[in-house]
Design a protein with these regions (language model features):
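Surface-exposed, low-hydrophobicity beta-strand/loop segments enriched in small/polar/acidic residues
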Residues: 1-130
C-alpha cells in the first residue's frame, strides 16, 4: 500500500511541475505541510500513513510523530493544472524540505513521474524518483 499525499493550495489546485513541500516538523502522520507553487498562496495539509486530511498549520506535533522521509514508494495525489494533458509516464519536478528540531534544513530534490491519471483528469498520482 503506497502512501497518498494530496497537496492543495487555497484554490484547491497545485501545479505538479513546481510542487514544493515544506514543514517545520518531521514528516509523519498528522504533520502539517505547506504547498507553494509559483506565486500561488500556500495551504496547510497533513500527511497520513495512507490518506490525508486537511489540518491547520498549528496541528503539527514536534517530537510526537515518527520521522518519514519521502521515498520512492510514496505516491503524491495532486491536482494537475498544467497546460499539457497529463499522462502516465510524464516526468515532473518534485522537491521537499524538512527542518528538524536542530534547525538544520534537509532538502530532497528529484523527479516525479505520473503513474496514473484519476477518473477526474485533473487529478494525477505522482511517484517520487531520486
Amino acid at each position: 500500500m503506497f502512501r497518498l499525499v494530496k497537496v492543495l493550495n487555497s484554490n484547491n489546485q497545485c501545479e505538479v511541475s513546481r510542487l514544493k513541500i515544506a514543514t517545520t516538523a518531521n514528516f509523519g502522520p498528522g504533520c502539517a505541510l505547506t504547498c507553494s507553487s509559483g506565486s500561488l498562496s500556500s495551504a496547510a495539509v497533513a500527511m497520513m500513513p495512507d490518506y490525508i486530511s486537511m489540518v491547520g498549520s498549528n496541528d503539527a506535533e514536534d517530537g510526537k510523530i515518527d520521522a518519514m522521509f519521502v521515498t520512492e514508494d510514496m505516491v503524491f495525489k495532486v491536482e494537475f493544472t498544467g497546460t499539457t494533458a497529463p499522462y502516465p509516464g510524464m516526468t515532473v519536478g518534485l522537491s521537499t524540505k524538512k527542518q528538524k528540531m536542530d534547525s538544520v534544513t534537509h532538502s530532497t530534490t528529484g523527479k516525479g513521474m505520473i503513474i496514473d491519471v484519476d477518473d477526474n483528469p485533473n487529478l494525477v498520482y505522482v511517484r517520487f524518483r531520486r
